[in-house]
Structure formats: structure tokens, C-alpha cells
Amino acid sequence: MRAAILREYNKDLSIETVSDPECPEDGVILKVLACGVCRPDWHGWVGEHPRIKPGQIGGHEYCGEVIEAGPRATYKKGDRLVAPFILSCGSCPTCQSGAGHTCPNQRLPGFTEPGAFAEYVAVPFDHNLARLPETLSPTVAAGLGCR
């Protein structure tokens, strides 16, 4: 797949061919339909965000269509979904108390793992995802998952 990768701070992102993501058992692979650009992306691009390092595929506000679902996933191929910025595990005591936004096992696409500045993105913990109505365009929906 093609992806936009940060190779150097303050330089253009590099469009490269990289391996397709592997599908998580409890998640999905989305074909990215739209991905926004947010202030934290800019902070990473200029080297001011401690979690975004050269080599990272950014993109944390996105939506897509399921092309593959893991065996423990609740969504199926063809579903259109939007993802939040913070993917909580859903099973730790913090998540069980309703504070998933502070989950110690959280995953942050575009920060702690490859994001959606790519053709495809792996999304673990699919309980975080939300189905998109057919009437909502991907470009409008993409920003809904950002904080």
C-alpha cells in the first residue's frame, strides 16, 4: 500500500510503498476513505510532539470501509466506520469504570502505531468504532473521531 511517512521534521512527507497492515484478532482493516489533518499532526511534523518520530505514518482522525475483520471483531466487510483518536482496550479496570480515555493500554494511531495517512489502517479494539450512516460523507465523518 502507499503511505505518507514522516522522514524528517519540517520536510514534505514521503509517499512510499509499505507492507499492508495485519488484521488484529479483535479489530479490522479499514480502507481509508478520508483522513483529516489536525494540529497534533503539525506538531509532529515540526518535531514538537514527543510521540511522533521520523518513520511514523500519521493520521488520527479518519473513517473507512472494512476490508477485513478479525475473528473476534464485531464488524464485517463493507461496514463504513469512524474511529476515535484514543482506542481503549475495553477490558482493564480503568475502561470498566467508564474512563476509557485514560486507558493504560490505549493505542493511538498516528502516534503510537501507524495511522491513516495511508491506503489502509489496522484498528484494534473494534468496540471503539462507530458505524457511519450512508447519508454522511467520509470527508465530514473523518474529523468526528478527533478528541
Whereabouts are the PLM-identified features?
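NAD(P)H dinucleotide-binding glycine-rich loop of Rossmann-like/cofactor-binding domains
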Residues: C89-R147
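Cytochrome P450 core scaffold surrounding the K-helix E-X-X-R motif
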Residues: P40-W45
